[in-house]
Amino acid sequence: MKRLGIDIGSTTIKSAVVDEEGSIIWSTYERHQSKINLKLSGLVHEIRDKFPLDKEMIVAFSGSAGMGMAESLSVPFVQEVYATRTAVREREKDCDVVIELGGEDAKILFLTGGVEVRMNGSCAGGTGAFIDQMAQLMGITPTVM
């Protein structure tokens, strides 16, 4: 059965459909401009048109605005750090560090020896300030990152 993941963040809505083998067969990325319900409705129609023969998909939401949507639709919510960690471990076995820049925050995940997550202050979210902070923390230059 195919799986559909929808990440609704503070500024964008992303989605991906994954086939039975775990390959991404379709994805989207667009700004929602605070019109989350409208964008989600359009996205659902687009998915239905793209996959008309797939009567069922496993669906989950993530993202800062995804929790409320998942709750209102009775769909599972997956915390985005967990989703990122799972995907990276499956697809990039040698990866040690993941930097995720979002619209309202930024995170760095250290994967070796378990998982350690660090997050910047919201005021620098989605900016290069976080990269500078993390480079300093790791004792390297931003260029090396």
Residue ranges of each PLM-predicted region?
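Active-site cofactor/substrate anionic-group-binding motifs, chiefly glycine-
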Residues: E80-I99
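Short glycine-rich, Thr/Ser-proximal phosphate-binding strand/loop in the N-terminal lobe
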Residues: R3-L38, G42, E116-V117, G121
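Short beta-strand-loop/turn "lid" adjacent to the catalytic site in phosphate-handling enzymes
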Residues: Y29-H32, R48-Y82, L109-R118
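A short acidic Gly-Thr/Ser loop motif
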Residues: D7-T11, G63-S64, L101-D105, T127
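Alpha-helix C-terminal capping segments
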Residues: E71, V88-K93, F110-G113, L137-M138
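Short glycine-aspartate micro-motif
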Residues: R3-D7, I58-A60, D94-I99
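Glycine-rich phosphate-binding loop plus the immediately following alpha-helix
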Residues: K35, G113-M145
